[in-house]
Amino acid sequence: MDGLVELIEQKKKRQSKSRDSDVNGTLPVETSPSANWFSQMSTSKSNKKVPLSSVTSIIDGLKRLYIQKLKPLEVTYRFNDFVSPLLTNSDFDAKPMVMLLGQYSTGKTTFIKHLLKSSYPGAHIGPEPTTDRFVVVMSGPDERSIPGNTVAVQADMPFNGLTTFGTSFLSKFECSQMPHPLLEHITFVDTPGVLSGEKQRTQRSYDFTGVTSWFASKCDLILLLFDPHKLDISDEFKRVISSLRGHDDKIRVVLNKADQVDTQQLMRVYGALMWSLGKVLNTPEVARVYIGSFNDKPINEHVIGPIGKELFEREQEDLLSDLKDIPKKACDRRINEFVKRARAAKIHAYIISHLKKAMPAMMGKAKVQQRLIDNLGDEFAKVQREFHLPAGDFPNVDQFREVLSGYNIDKFEKLKPKMIQGVDDMLGYDIPDVLKKFRNPYD
């Protein structure tokens, strides 16, 4: 842990030096010339487009490209209603986030306390399901807890998109702020324990899986925590893991509290965990599993022996090195997520315009709309063949159908080739030009 804090301090010093130079990869929020872009309509003819030659960093360049080329496409084809809310200034300037997921009492809150070496406002620990809300642990001038409704409307925080989940969720969401050197570079998301019973799951007053998916798209690392005594993956946990589709590169598995079993039992537990994950993670690659006991107590060497202690220490070092790399990779992750979003918006535009094209001009619109909704999978296949798109990039059919049923397809826009070409140019030329011009601030 000392090495993690030292590295953060070194990077902090390098950042303060790099602010004096002309070229850097980050943009302070207070001096950003683009602070008011998101309050303006980019599609207005009176607005003059700012040339990309005047950008001052990679993040600045992504902001301008989003406003000028990607946001008009998203607004035209209602991407924000179907897939993801429109991005705001704070989404680009946000610190890297790490989300912890797992069943109750697998050590999620204790894990954060272990990294911070102190408790945080609103932290509750116990053998029963203690964390009953989503808690964002981030840097702040003093220790305090901010209610979810307040957090969601603050322009300088990247949580405006959570308003789509309603007041019932926001009452189960809060932000915990405290001054800490680690939190100046990384934000943690503590989640409620995933429930094992179907009855308890249905009593949640909000879309738990949807909220998890929203956070997954914003996070830089997702830690799935397991307890040696809780290896079963419940139906809700399966749905949660399935909602992480498309973010496989962010997922790490942590077998926590592993010093509660001896070496022979640990081998069996590890095998059972890998078997369970193999049925849920639909990927041929093997997920990275860290074994250890991530709390402030000394490792129970009496149970696991000297070999187990050495293994746990090395595993902990590997996990900490993964966490150390997060700020360094944050800029690359922003670019990666931006490109993924642009491709998703393009495919969404193709789908919406295809459905609009299939509608009749005069009679029988209601019947045709119902047929299109019922056979949405076939329509996706037609779009895929027409535009030569990868099948894996298409949205979930059932979720898309659920949202689509509330709209009048005839009101959708036809395909606008100029907008599509603008996004293609952005992916093919503008983003590579920005990357050539600026460097990662942590390099």
Predicted regions span which residues?
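Switch/connector loops and helix/strand junctions flanking conserved nucleotide-binding motifs
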Residues: 2, 145-148, 196-198, 232-234, ...
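Conserved G1/Walker A P-loop phosphate-binding module
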Residues: 2-11, 24-188, 196
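Short linear motifs centered on serine/threonine within intrinsically disordered regions
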Residues: 12-21
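Alpha-helical interaction elements in eukaryotic regulators
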Residues: 54, 58, 62, 107-108, ...
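Short amphipathic alpha-helices and their capping/turn residues within compact interaction modules
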Residues: 67, 71, 78, 103-106, ...
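Short coil/turn segments at secondary-structure boundaries
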Residues: 78, 112-117, 127-128, 149-152, ...
